[in-house]
Regions:
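A short helix-loop-beta-strand connector motif used in the catalytic cores of GNAT acetyltransferases and
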Residues: 65-66, 78-94
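Residues that form generic nucleotide/phosphate-binding pockets
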Residues: 48, 59, 77-80, 84, ...
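Generic, well-ordered alpha-helical segments
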Residues: 37, 48, 66-73, 87
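Acyl-donor (CoA/ACP) binding surface of acyl/acetyltransferases
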Residues: 1-44, 48-55, 92-224
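Conserved GNAT-fold acetyl-CoA-binding loop/helix
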Residues: 57-79
Length: 224
């Protein structure tokens, strides 16, 4: 899992140009909503992060000694991510659960970011996410990932999406397995996580592998 907190070490790079993408973007499928971070979401974001601190700590990005600190507040985080999103370098979303499609009952479930977006001969991006422990295992993150992947392959015109996961993160490994991401092996000491450089397993998906869309494939798999 690539963490997407204020200290994320993933630096976005030059983005592709597309006529079909213009930030801000909100995506929805059933009760799952991907919405841009807003300043008014700060209270909910800080509360969920605080309540899940022990759950998230083993998978959280940390900064190597000597690194420049990232935004220190949620306000700064929103400004930084929004600027990079408008430039097409990343897609930062909060993941909301809306029971019965009722926005008044919306509950913050987690966060998902597509970062490191590049165009040209590379045309790819990386997905990172986290979820509230109390909502884990309910299909929220697989649905959110499928929504994001379809948007990247469609509106963004990307060719490849990667997800890097620590081998110990069994729950996150289940997400990519359910969605049919292709395993590509181990990258030793790939990201600075929980205070040290950690090995990660890399999983990828190319646009031609899901011509019908990842969300449709995921929905078909969930049907009894």
């Amino acid at each position: 899992m690539l963490p997407v907190g204020p200290d994320s070490p993933l630096l976005p790079r030059r983005a592709p140009r597309t006529r079909r993408h213009r930030w801000p973007v909100t995506l929805q499928h059933g009760e799952i909503v991907l919405a841009p971070l807003r300043q008014r979401d700060g209270g909910a974001w800080e509360r969920v992060r605080r309540e899940n601190s022990a759950w998230l700590r083993p998978w959280e990005a940390t900064l190597p000694p000597g690194s420049d600190p990232g935004p220190a507040t949620f306000t700064g985080l929103v400004r930084t991510l929004s600027h990079q999103a408008r430039e097409g370098r990343m897609l930062p979303w909060l993941v909301w659960l809306e029971p019965g499609g009722d926005r008044k009952r919306a509950r913050l479930a987690g966060q998902l970011t597509v970062s490191g977006i590049v165009g040209g001969s590379a045309s790819w991006g990386q997905i990172g996410y986290w979820v509230d422990q109390r909502l884990a295992g309910r299909g929220i993150i697989p649905t959110a990932v499928a929504l994001a992947v379809d948007y990247c392959f469609g509106a963004m015109g990307l060719n490849r999406i990667e997800i890097a996961i620590r081998p110990e993160n069994v729950r996150s490994l289940r997400v990519v397995a359910k969605l049919g991401f292709r395993p590509e092996g181990l990258r030793p000491r790939y990201l600075h996580i929980d205070g040290d450089w950690r090995d990660h397993l890399v999983f990828a998906l190319n646009a031609e592998e899901v011509p019908e869309g990842l969300l449709r494939r995921w929905d078909n798999l969930r049907r009894p």
